[in-house]
UniProtKB/Swiss-Prot annotation:
InterPro entries: Asp/Orn_carbamoyltranf_P-bd, Asp/Orn_carbamoylTrfase, Asp/Orn_carbamoylTrfase_sf, Asp_carbamoyltransf, Asp_carbamoyltransf_Asp/Orn-bd. PANTHER family: ASPARTATE CARBAMOYLTRANSFERASE, ORNITHINE CARBAMOYLTRANSFERASE, MITOCHONDRIAL. It comes from Helicobacter pylori (strain P12). It is an enzyme of class 2 (transferase). Gene3D superfamilies: Aspartate/ornithine carbamoyltransferase. Its EC number is 2.1.3.2. This is Aspartate carbamoyltransferase catalytic subunit. Heterododecamer (2C3:3R2) of six catalytic PyrB chains organized as two trimers (C3), and six regulatory PyrI chains organized as three dimers (R2). It catalyses: carbamoyl phosphate + L-aspartate = N-carbamoyl-L-aspartate + phosphate + H(+). The gene is pyrB. Pfam families: OTCace (PF00185), OTCace_N (PF02729). Coiled coil: none annotated.
Length: 307
């Protein structure tokens, strides 16, 4: 029987006090990546972390790698395209074999929402979900929260703020994780997308981006995940962008002088999701999200491996 071990599979695995602890620690690292204590570095020095990514990643896998190295740990990234899964080895057997090598933590990404929960049944080391199907991406939600926490000056100032998710909400694990986390913190939520990209939900919805901009203090644009669509929804991405791109013109006309915050989990389709000029605007926090990804993942790794 596996020993009890803390995992991070979804944001609900964390209490509000633990979320606050992570925000405080990540804020320190966001201000100075070198602010790792000597004690932490000594404890992390012999830790070995394995990254098992069965889906493509740029920001998340690089962010975890840099976070691990900054803490003083070692990370092993497996290329799953050249692993034994390509020879017919099952996912569970691959995981059990890696687990038998006794890493100190495993970070995984997979196309199926249930995968991290299945793997956690066998894991005696911390397991971190770096994206599962369309359901969860907890560290992305936490780094997005850190970005808002910094901008608005604390959790108490986030309560009552309004956030609109614009784009392929139905297929977005980022949206799903953020919605669950931000609801716990008292934010009001609107979903904006064509009907085919909206989930069945009791949340407020609209098909009109102008309505979403008028509603929101925070806009989170989402990539159109064509790889998860059974059939084309728009004739082209350009047609989609004509309806749902966050542009300077739309912000000027409908933000009503609000200093809206603009987020995107990446990768951004320029001039489809967000206009290039808006990405360079001070209201865009996209690169801050990327920086905060390293800081938050440092905090998460330290929390799971040392606390």
């Amino acid at each position: 029987m596996p020993k009890k071990c803390r995992h991070l599979l979804q944001t609900s695995d964390l209490s509000l006090d633990e979320i606050k602890l992570l925000l405080n620690k990540a804020s320190v690292y966001a201000n100075d990546f070198n602010a790792v204590s000597l004690e932490t570095k000594e404890k992390m020095h012999n830790k070995i972390i394995v990254a098992l990514f069965f889906e493509n990643s740029t920001r998340t896998v690089s962010s975890f790698e840099i976070a691990s190295l900054r803490l003083g740990a070692k990370i092993v990234k497996l290329n799953m395209q050249t692993s034994s899964t390509s020879k017919g080895e099952t996912l569970i057997d691959t995981f059990k074999n890696i687990h038998a090598m006794q890493p100190d933590a495993i970070i995984t990404r997979h196309a199926f929402s249930s995968t991290p929960f299945k793997l956690a049944e066998f894991s005696q080391c911390p397991l971190i979900n770096a994206g599962s199907g369309t359901s969860a991406h907890p560290t992305q939600a936490l780094l997005d929260l850190l970005t808002l926490y910094q901008h608005f000056g604390g959790l108490e100032n986030l309560k009552g703020k309004k956030i609109a998710f614009i784009g392929d909400v139905k297929n977005s694990r980022v949206a799903n994780s953020n919605i669950k986390l931000l609801q716990r913190l008292g934010l009001e939520i609107m979903l904006c997308a064509p009907s085919s990209m909206l989930p069945s939900t009791p949340l407020r919805t609209t098909h009109n981006i102008e309505e979403a901009i008028e509603f929101a203090d925070i806009l989170m644009s989402l990539r159109t995940q064509t790889e998860r669509h059974n059939a084309p929804i728009f004739a082209s991405l350009k047609d989609y962008g004509n309806a749902y791109c966050i542009t300077q013109q739309r912000l000027k006309a409908h933000a009503k002088n609000k200093e809206v915050v603009i987020l995107h989990p990446g990768p951004v389709h320029r001039d489809i999701d967000i206009e290039s000029a808006v990405l360079e605007d001070k209201r865009s926090k996209v690169l801050e999200q990327v920086k905060n990804g390293v800081a938050m993942r440092m905090a998460v790794l330290e929390f799971l491996l040392l606390d």
